[in-house]
């Protein structure tokens, strides 16, 4: 999963996040609200195994603000259509700023829209009135109170409050028409196939001697969506997908003079013609940079046609610099 809205990002936890999760989970001040004032006492090795386990029913997510990790979320299926979620803002300097409600809303919207979920549940401790206020403001409905249902780390009996949310109950704390970015799902293949020809057509007009109007190979799209280390990030307003960025992790080739680097390659960036000029290209580039950083890339690389001045200006504004020039001689 990869979601981006404003300065906030929700992304899959990766192996490189194990040490950070270990620090948070072993911190009693972070875990006290969950009933573990002494921390979990876990290890980086155990967390690495959990993240690596494809059979683990818990989907672990990292929360970022301005590309800085600030906390974590998770969700797991109780049944095919019901997801249980949890959230912790772990860095104290990012707490009580209203970020939690936005992040919960981002995740709930995504689960309802693109993951087949029709019901979301969560619980919190009875004394956590602030969390209850946040949940109820987002549309969650209290479904019950379980008195003295578990003992915390100190042996104290605790009472839990249960909540549920249905799609029609979700109250977004932001304008639902604001542009945002999410990672593509298999069901998005058709819209991606429809946008691709607009990119190829524009490129063919710039360099018709080398590029022609065409459709993209559906197998290429499917592999990028489903294979690890690859992604298609979609720019969306409301329910309408308006553009995408295709990115994958790779490595410098094994050539003796090359300094070895893991890096991300932005293969394609496309925005529908009618939606251009509204900042969607910038939004996608920023999301791709965040994706690349999270995946351990040392840098993000892309190519541009030499006469595509609009694209070149965009890339330079976003911090890209020229590295290699390709020369071609007609024979």
Regions found by a protein language model. Give the residues of each.
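Acetyl-CoA-dependent GNAT
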Residues: 37-94, 104, 110, 166-168, ...
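Conserved acetyl-CoA-binding loop of GNAT-fold acetyltransferases
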Residues: 136-146, 297, 316-325
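Conserved acetyl-CoA-binding loop-helix of GNAT-fold acetyltransferases
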Residues: 96-110, 132-137, 268-271, 277-290, ...
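Active-site acidic-Proline motif in GNAT/NAT acetyltransferases
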Residues: 91-93, 126-127, 272-274, 278, ...
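Conserved beta-strand-loop-alpha-helix junction that forms the acyl-donor binding cleft
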Residues: 122-132, 149-154, 301-311, 328-331
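Conserved GNAT acetyl-CoA-binding A-motif
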Residues: 113-123, 292-303
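Conserved N-terminal entry element of GNAT/NAT acetyltransferase domains
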Residues: 1-15, 32, 161-187
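Terminal substrate-recognition subdomain of acyl/acetyltransferases
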Residues: 155-177, 316-317, 321, 326-331
């Amino acid at each position: 999963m990869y979601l981006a809205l404003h300065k906030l990002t929700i992304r899959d936890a990766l192996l490189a996040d194990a040490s950070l999760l270990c620090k948070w989970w072993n911190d009693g001040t972070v875990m006290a609200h969950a009933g573990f004032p002494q921390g979990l006492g876990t290890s980086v090795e155990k967390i690495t195994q959990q993240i690596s386990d494809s059979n683990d029913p818990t989907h672990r997510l990292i929360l970022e603000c301005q590309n800085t990790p600030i906390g974590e979320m998770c969700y797991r299926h109780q049944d095919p259509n019901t997801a249980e979620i949890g959230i912790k803002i772990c860095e104290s300097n990012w707490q009580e700023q209203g970020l939690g409600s936005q992040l919960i809303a981002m995740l709930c919207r995504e689960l309802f829209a693109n993951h087949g979920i029709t019901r979301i549940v969560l619980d919190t401790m009875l004394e956590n009135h602030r969390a209850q206020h946040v949940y109820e403001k987002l549309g969650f409905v209290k479904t019950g109170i379980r008195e003295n249902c578990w003992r915390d780390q100190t042996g104290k009996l605790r009472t839990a409050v249960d909540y549920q949310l249905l799609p029609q109950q979700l109250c977004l704390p932001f304008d639902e028409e604001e542009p945002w970015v999410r990672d593509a799902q298999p069901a998005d293949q058709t819209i991606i196939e429809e946008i691709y020809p607009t990119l190829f057509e524009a490129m063919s007009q710039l360099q018709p001697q080398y590029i022609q109007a065409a459709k993209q190979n559906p197998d290429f799209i499917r592999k990028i969506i489903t294979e690890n280390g690859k992604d298609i990030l979609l720019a969306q307003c409301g329910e309408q997908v308006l553009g995408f960025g295709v990115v994958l992790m790779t490595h410098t080739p094994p050539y003796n003079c090359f300094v070895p680097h893991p890096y991300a390659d932005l293969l394609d960036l496309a925005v529908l013609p009618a939606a251009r000029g509204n900042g969607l290209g910038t939004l996608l580039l920023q999301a791709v940079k965040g994706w690349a950083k999270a995946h351990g890339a040392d840098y993000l690389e892309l190519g541009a046609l030499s006469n595509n001045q609009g694209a070149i200006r965009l890339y330079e504004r976003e911090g890209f610099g020229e590295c290699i020039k390709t020369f071609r001689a007609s024979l």
